[in-house]
Regions:
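Mid-to-C-terminal alpha-helical segments outside catalytic/metal-binding sites
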Residues: 12-22, 48-66, 232, 238-240, ...
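Hydrophobic faces of well-ordered beta-strands that scaffold small-molecule active sites
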Residues: 24-28, 67-70, 94-97, 119-121, ...
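Conserved, mostly hydrophobic/aromatic
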Residues: 27, 59, 82, 119, ...
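Glycine-rich phosphate-binding "P-loop"
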Residues: 38-49, 67-70, 117-133
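Alpha-helical scaffold segments that flank or form the walls of functional sites
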Residues: 41-89, 109
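Active-site gating/metal-coordination segments in enzymes
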Residues: 76-159, 166-168, 207-216, 220
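Catalytic pocket-lining loop regions of alpha/beta-barrel enzymes
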Residues: 133-243
Length: 290
């Protein structure tokens, strides 16, 4: 596994004035300490330690009162590092776990009590099974987590799934897509999979995270080629959008972003303060149960 650069943090407190009270960063990962929480042997990268104290300092700097920790692929189904972080700040944090498909109700209830509000399916950062959506198993898992009011979060490239809305029709729980749908900007906003995502969002069945523009771009900060994707989502379904920093920016190839600049980018994408308030406060409160 290859290592990654150290994470960034926001450079100054100039960003604080732009985010409303109770703003939520809905996408970040804690990694390590590796000696206490060893990484999965089948991981495709090895992150530097990215610890809760540093993450909370970043949140304070950009003005986020709440946050959601998402289980990274380097831990597979071992959620201990994420759960340890949730236990340190249960009022501020929620979690999205990775669980085996045969997870039982008792484990789901244990995770719910710890602050978990969803499960993640990552079909990108894999050695095997990459790009394959195990729909039958996912429907079964979704039925198991539905009593807790959870959702299923996907890390996938929507441009690879032109029939996405039909494949996920009548899915038992809401679905959430990371990184604006994770279509490369070269696919364009007329891409069939991206349009299918928008249809799901308009129906209230799906959410999208305004995260990781550096994972889609063919450019560099401020990633101007991602603007059209963000605008299309904001115009179509602002009630189904949430924002996240994607801290600590693992396996980023375009240069380590500054988290304050990413906060500024949301202001650029969503200049209307009322809409921004929905994306930062109301929508995540509804999805994660703050």
């Amino acid at each position: 596994p290859r290592s990654t650069p150290l994470y960034s943090s926001a450079a100054s407190d100039v960003y604080k004035r732009q985010f409303p009270p109770l703003a939520c960063d809905t996408h970040a990962h804690v990694c390590g300490p590796a000696a206490r929480f060893p990484y999965w042997s089948e991981r495709i990268y090895t992150p530097p330690d990215a610890l809760l104290g540093d993450f909370r300092a970043m949140l304070d700097t950009i003005g986020c009162a709440r946050a959601v920790l998402v289980q990274p692929s380097v831990y597979d189904t071992d959620n201990r590092a994420m759960l340890a972080a949730l236990a340190q700040d249960p009022g501020r944090l929620r979690g999205v776990a990775v669980v085996p498909f045969d997870v039982d109700a008792a484990e789901i209830e244990r995770l719910h009590a710890a602050g978990v509000r969803g499960v993640r399916c990552n079909i990108v950062d894999l050695k095997t099974g990459k790009g394959q959506l195990p729909l039958d198993a996912l429907r079964s898992l979704a039925a198991k987590v539905k009593p807790c009011g959870w959702h299923v979060e996907f890390l996938m490239h929507v441009n690879e799934f032109p029939d996405l809305d039909r494949q996920l029709a009548h899915f038992p729980v809401p679905v959430v897509f990371g990184h604006l749908g994770y279509a490369p900007t070269s696919a364009g906003t007329s891409d069939a999979g991206f349009k299918a995502l928008i249809r799901l969002m308009k129906d209230g069945a799906a959410w999208a995270k305004m995260t990781g523009p550096y994972r889609l771009t063919a450019s560099s900060m401020p990633y101007p080629d991602t603007d059209a994707f963000a605008s299309a989502l904001v115009e179509a379904a602002p009630q189904q959008l949430i924002w996240g920093s994607d801290w600590p920016h693992v396996i980023v190839k375009t240069g380590m972003p500054n988290d304050g600049d990413l906060a500024d980018l949301l202001i650029h994408w969503v200049p209307d303060a009322a809409v921004r308030n929905r994306i930062l406060v109301d929508n995540p409160a509804r999805l994660y149960g703050f």
